């Protein structure tokens, strides 16, 4: 099957499946999710074998440590994916929820009810877990999904899609509800970007290059999941022990993800007392530090930070550090270089915290906590399909509610308009 025919055929199947999914009951959708979870565990050996092929190819291509980490599947990650599907099954079904109802003077009753978006296209890079998370969320919310993963995870995505789609269909979901574009040909992406006849929305997940390509070239509506150039600002009135714990977690707990911190801003009043011990702890964890001139005066072994560093999402054990002279300077830096993803302040001053919350324009703004919590699971949404950095139609971690739209339902008793 050539690429154009594959996109057309799977698009038609998805459109047909979406009509059935929209009316599929909650219990039937949950049964399918639980069947998918069981299938992942039962087919673990085949999934890991497919992933091993991708890992070998990735190492031969010289993929970075961060990319290889995102690509890797192991028993724990498969268990986590299965657990995520079970958690999703336990969540309330947003579809059919009447969010408001009112009566007009003429007696008309008007309600606003949640409904699926329809067919969702997901274009993503080397993260096989996205295959399962996206499929599960779309099924939960009555949406059909067409997946197009990165070539680095080709075999993993094939194996995962085969396992979960068969399980979902056997449990009562329509055929075509979960489909993967099974080619590494980049033309498939170009075709999906213009597949208005089949797709209701496209969601890209990946690096800046992929997201920019989708946003600039798609004729299908796009929900932009942005790059995470995230900051932590350590205020003059911060608890420095707390600040060190937060910084180390935000940078090193999992550096290859979009909610990891990339730049640390430190108020000049605490820089001399805070940075030496922090730098030693970061060095012990293998972090490369790139600092401004004032940072390097305190941490002599730090590399020189350039203008490019302030704007870079490293996705690696690299941290840029800048000493600032005020909250205003920190806010200005975040405004200039931030990507409206996740930003944090560490402070004991309530008014300073309130000002930071009010003035930082980001999907998630933290006081005294790590940026690593910007995540659908951590927010209690179950799985997430991505973290939106735009303001329409969704913002922040996109859980089930964010994969619905609404329609109005109107009950009358013979009213006609005069």
From Swiss-Prot:
Reactions performed catalytically: L-glutamate 5-semialdehyde + phosphate + NADP(+) = L-glutamyl 5-phosphate + NADPH + H(+)
Top-level division of the source organism's lineage: Bacteria
Listed InterPro entries: Ald_DH/histidinol_DH (IPR016161), Ald_DH_C (IPR016163), Ald_DH_N (IPR016162), Aldehyde_DH_dom (IPR015590), G-glutamylP_reductase_CS (IPR020593), Glu-5-SA_DH (IPR012134), GPR_dom (IPR000965)
Keywords for the protein's UniProt record, in alphabetical order: Amino-acid biosynthesis, Cytoplasm, NADP, Oxidoreductase, Proline biosynthesis
EC number: 1.2.1.41
Pathway annotation from the record: Amino-acid biosynthesis; L-proline biosynthesis; L-glutamate 5-semialdehyde from L-glutamate: step 2/2
One function term, GO molecular function aspect: NADP binding
GO cellular component: cytoplasm
BP GO annotations: L-proline biosynthetic process
PROSITE patterns linked to this entry: PROA
Protein localization: Cytoplasm
A Pfam family per the record: Aldedh
CDD domains referenced in this protein's UniProt entry, alphabetically: ALDH_F18-19_ProA-GPR (cd07079)
PANTHER family in UniProt: DELTA-1-PYRROLINE-5-CARBOXYLATE SYNTHASE, GLUTAMATE SEMIALDEHYDE DEHYDROGENASE
Entry function: Catalyzes the NADPH-dependent reduction of L-glutamate 5-phosphate into L-glutamate 5-semialdehyde and phosphate. The product spontaneously undergoes cyclization to form 1-pyrroline-5-carboxylate.
Family classification: Belongs to the gamma-glutamyl phosphate reductase family.
HAMAP family: ProA
Name the record gives this protein: Gamma-glutamyl phosphate reductase
Source organism: Moorella thermoacetica (strain ATCC 39073 / JCM 9320)
Gene: proA
């Amino acid at each position: 099957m050539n690429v154009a025919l594959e996109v057309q055929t799977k698009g038609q199947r998805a459109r047909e499946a979406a009509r059935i999914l929209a009316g599929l009951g909650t219990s039937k959708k949950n049964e399918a999710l639980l069947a998918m979870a069981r299938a992942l565990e039962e087919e673990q050996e085949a999934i890991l074998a497919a992933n091993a092929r991708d890992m070998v190819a990735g190492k031969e291509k010289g993929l970075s440590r961060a990319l290889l980490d995102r690509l890797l599947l192991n028993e724990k990650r498969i268990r986590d994916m299965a657990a995520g599907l079970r958690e999703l099954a336990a969540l309330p079904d947003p579809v059919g929820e009447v969010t408001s109802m009112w009566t007009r003077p003429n007696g008309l009753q008007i309600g606003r009810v949640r409904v699926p978006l329809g067919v969702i296209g997901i274009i993503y890079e080397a993260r096989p877990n996205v295959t399962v998370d996206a499929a599960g969320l779309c099924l939960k919310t009555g949406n059909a999904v067409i997946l197009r993963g990165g070539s680095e995870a080709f075999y993993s995505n094939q194996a995962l899609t085969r396992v979960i789609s068969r399980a979902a269909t056997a449990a009562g979901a329509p055929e075509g509800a979960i489909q993967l574009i099974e080619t590494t040909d980049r033309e498939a992406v170009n075709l999906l970007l213009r597949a208005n006849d089949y797709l209701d929305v496209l969601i890209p997940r990946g690096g800046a290059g992929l997201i920019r390509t989708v946003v600039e070239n798609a004729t299908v509506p796009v929900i932009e999941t942005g790059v995470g150039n995230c900051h932590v600002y350590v205020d003059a009135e911060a608890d420095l022990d707390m600040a060190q714990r937060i910084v180390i977690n935000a940078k090193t707990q999992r550096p290859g993800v979009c909610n990891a911190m990339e730049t640390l801003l430190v108020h000049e009043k605490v820089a001399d007392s805070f940075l030496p011990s922090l730098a030693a702890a970061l060095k012990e964890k293998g972090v490369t530090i790139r600092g401004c001139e004032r940072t390097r005066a305190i941490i002599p072994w730090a590399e020189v930070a350039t203008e490019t560093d302030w704007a870079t999402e490293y996705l690696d054990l690299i941290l840029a550090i800048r000493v600032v002279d005020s909250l205003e300077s920190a806010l200005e830096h975040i405004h200039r270089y931030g990507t409206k993803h996740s930003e944090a302040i560490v402070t004991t001053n309530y008014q300073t915290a309130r000002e930071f919350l009010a003035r930082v324009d980001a999907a998630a703004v933290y006081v005294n906590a790590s940026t690593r919590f910007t995540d659908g699971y951590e927010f209690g949404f179950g799985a997430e399909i991505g973290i939106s950095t735009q303001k329409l139609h969704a913002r922040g971690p996109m859980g089930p509610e964010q994969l619905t739209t609404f329609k109005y339902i109107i009950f009358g008793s013979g009213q006609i308009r005069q």
